[in-house]
C-alpha cells in the first residue's frame, strides 16, 4: 500500500511511540515520504519555503521513525517516532502545548 499523492501534499501526524503523545503535524510530498522511508528519519515539505526539510537537521532534535500508517483513503499519514529532544521549534516537547478547553 502506498500513499496517494495525486492531490498534492499529505498531512503527517507525528506521534511519540512510547507515550502516544501527538508531537506535531507537518506535510509530506512524495519525495519527503521516500526520504523518510530510506533514512528512517522524518522529512517534510515546507509549504512556506516550498522545499524539503529534515526534522532536527539543524537543532539535533531528530525523529527516529518506528512505524508509518496510512489512513483508509491513503491521503494521510501517521508517523510513530522516537523523539530526541523537544519536537517543537519553540523548545516545547510537543507543538500542541496550547490548551484551549
Swiss-Prot record:
Reported cofactor(s): Mg(2+); Zn(2+)
Cofactor binding summary note: Binds 1 Mg(2+) ion per subunit.
Presence of keyword Lyase: no
Catalytic activity entry: 1-(5-phospho-beta-D-ribosyl)-5'-AMP + H2O = 1-(5-phospho-beta-D-ribosyl)-5-[(5-phospho-beta-D-ribosylamino)methylideneamino]imidazole-4-carboxamide
Key word Phosphoprotein present: no
Binding site for Zn(2+): 72, 88, 95
EC number(s) given by UniProt: 3.5.4.19
Record GO biological process: L-histidine biosynthetic process
GO cellular-component term (any): cytoplasm
Biochemical pathway: Amino-acid biosynthesis; L-histidine biosynthesis; L-histidine from 5-phospho-alpha-D-ribose 1-diphosphate: step 3/9
Pfam families attached to this UniProt entry: PRA-CH (PF01502)
Protein name, as recorded: Phosphoribosyl-AMP cyclohydrolase
Taxonomic classification: Bacteria, Bacillati, Bacillota, Bacilli, Bacillales
Encoding gene (name): hisI
Amino acid at each position: 500500500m502506498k500513499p496517494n499523492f495525486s492531490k498534492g501534499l499529505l498531512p503527517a501526524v507525528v506521534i511519540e511511540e512510547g507515550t502516544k503523545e501527538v508531537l506535531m503535524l507537518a506535510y509530506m510530498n512524495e519525495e519527503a515520504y521516500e526520504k523518510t522511508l530510506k533514512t528512517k528519519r522524518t522529512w517534510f515539505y515546507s509549504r512556506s519555503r516550498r522545499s524539503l526539510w529534515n526534522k532536527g537537521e539543524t537543532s539535533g532534535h531528530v525523529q527516529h521513525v518506528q512505524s508509518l500508517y496510512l489512513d483508509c483513503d491513503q491521503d494521510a499519514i501517521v508517523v510513530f517516532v522516537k523523539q530526541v529532544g523537544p519536537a517543537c521549534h519553540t523548545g516545547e516537547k510537543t507543538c500542541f502545548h496550547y490548551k484551549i478547553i
